[in-house]
A protein has these predicted regions:
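N-terminal basic, amphipathic alpha-helical segments
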Residues: 1-123, 325, 329-336, 363, ...
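Short beta-strand "wing" residues that participate in macromolecule-binding interfaces
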Residues: 66-67, 158, 412
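Exposed, interaction-prone assembly regions rather than primary DNA-binding/catalytic cores
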Residues: 104-149
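Conserved core of the PLP fold type I
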Residues: 131-263, 275-276, 280-292
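Conserved core segment of the aminotransferase class I/II
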Residues: 291-358
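Short hydrophobic/aromatic beta-strand micro-patches
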Residues: 315, 391-393, 431-433
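Conserved glycine-rich beta-strand-loop-beta hairpin in the small C-terminal domain of fold type I
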Residues: 361-369, 379-393
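Conserved PLP cofactor-binding pocket of PLP-dependent enzymes
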Residues: 408-429
Length: 450
């Protein structure tokens, strides 16, 4: 079950511990199961007994295992496992002290075109809606059409009845997961994955299985075996992936779509970053490839425009949209009419916003990479295709680094927060949009804290 567990740049005990966590998290080694004796495990894996002892010891310290005299080492109940020392995405927005440099989130400031549009106001457009009760649970018809037109222009053919407007993409994610996943249901995600998606799945009580994801996208061999177990949902990002900034190659995307269609597993494709490319048009998605009844796309205004306008959407079949609409009515009735009217105006300026974002990110990406090379020359990363962050391998303990950084008032986002298994412990997600002076100050503080 461990497969090629020893592949990787890290020490064998750390690598073995991470592989065991993956098996435990995926349910292959259930709570209460006995692990092989250290000597037997070492012989089977071809490593020293010390390597196994160190891995077992690390997992016992983190609450995954328990050793009982005379009974060996067993998997501890999931309810007793100690959480990794990381903070979720939603936590990061509300618990950062004002005197702290926050490098834990990739959320962007408003694009210039956003300020221009908001200053113009919507007084004339608002007047007819003041004669109504103001509640439009599915979204204003004019915005549903504007989103459909925007998606169609960017390669995702859409009709207005396929769109449900939400109060941001996080609500879109939670509504979708509540409609598909029940307590204890199996849900597949990439590993690493978007923190908000993982939080939504945990909230609905999903049993999450992470599928190894590299610069080439999901490991389709592992995914095929997981799909055979008929999960409730597959959550993925084939366009611009958060946190890695990569995009799935065309051939792999075609293979993935074929697997989804054959399996019949509902698939939630998070497209929130798909138009945040470093250059060129928006990234390709699964929209033309997967059967419409199986695919749900999530989107937002936050990336191109501003997160302060809480506008997101769900794109799905009309039948599924009707189901989601009933859930949405229980959630918060409707999204702000004023924000929706601003959104209509903003979507007309999407090409301008995309050019502004690409220019800003291209400039800041270069200064971010230069600053990181200067302060941490041994850190490495793959060139990104888009998004607002670098997925950086520190080749060390990123959790420990984040704790040290916290003492000098710098907040980091270590890799375990992006993993269903607390994996990627050497990784950091660093935002690329900060001004060079602030970023260099933060990196200098981190350097001094070590």
């Amino acid at each position: 079950m461990l497969g090629d567990w020893s592949d990787g740049p890290h020490a064998l005990p750390e690598t073995l511990a991470a592989a065991l966590v993956s098996l435990i998290g995926a349910g292959f080694v259930p709570a209460g199961s006995a692990l092989p004796a250290q000597r037997d495990c070492a012989t089977a894996l071809g490593v020293s007994r010390g390597t196994v002892a160190a891995a077992y010891g690390a997992l016992e310290a983190r609450g995954y295992l328990v050793s009982v005299q005379g009974s060996g080492t067993r998997v501890r109940s999931g309810s007793n496992q100690a959480p990794a020392l990381v903070e979720g995405r939603l936590f990061s927005f509300t618990h950062t002290p004002v005197d702290t440099i926050d490098l834990s989130t990739g959320a962007l400031p408003a694009s210039p075109v956003t300020g221009e549009v908001l200053r113009e106001g919507v007084e004339e457009e608002l007047a007819p809606y003041l004669e109504t009760d103001g509640y439009f649970p599915a979204g204003l018809p004019v915005l549903r059409q504007a989103v459909a037109d925007h998606l169609s222009r960017t390669g995702i053919p859409t009709q207005a009845q396929q769109v449900l407007i939400t109060s941001g993409s996080q609500q879109a994610t939670f509504l979708t997961m509540r409609s598909l996943v029940g307590q204890g249901d199996l849900a597949l995600t990439e590993d690493p994955s978007y923190r908000g998606g993982l939080e939504a799945l945990r909230t609905v009580g999903a049993r999450i299985e992470g599928i190894r994801t590299t610069r080439e996208g999901l490991d389709l061999g592992l995914l095929a075996r997981a799909l055979a177990r008929k999960p409730a949902v597959l959550y993925c990002q084939t366009g611009i992936h958060n946190p890695t900034g990569q995009t799935m190659p065309h051939g792999a995307r075609l293979d993935l779509a074929t697997m989804i269609n054959r399996s019949g597993v509902p698939t939630v494709e998070d497209c929130c970053s798909y138009d945040l490319t470093v250059s060129g048009p928006p990234a390709t998605t699964l929209a033309r490839l997967v059967e419409p009844e199986l695919l749900i796309n999530l989107g937002t205004l936050s990336k191109l425009f501003w997160g302060g306008l809480r506008i997101g959407w769900i794109r799905a079949s009309p039948t599924r949209i009707r189901t989601l609409l009933e859930l949405r009515k229980v959630e918060d009735l409707a999204t702000s009419v004023i924000d929706q009217l601003h959104a209509v105006s903003l979507l007309r300026r999407a090409p301008d916003a995309r050019r502004q974002r690409q220019a800003m990110l291209a400039s800041h990406l270069k200064t971010t990479e230069d600053a990181v090379h200067e302060h941490f020359p041994h850190w490495t990363w793959d060139p990104i295709k888009g998004g607002s962050g670098l997925w950086v391998d520190t080749h060390g303990d990123a959790l420990a680094l984040a704790e040290m950084a916290k003492r000098v008032k710098v907040k980091l986002a270590p890799g375990p927060g992006f993993s269903p298994y607390d994996g990627h412990r050497s990784m950091l997600r660093l935002p690329v949009w900060h001004e060079p002076e602030l970023l260099r100050q933060a990196l200098q503080l981190i350097t001094g804290s070590k």
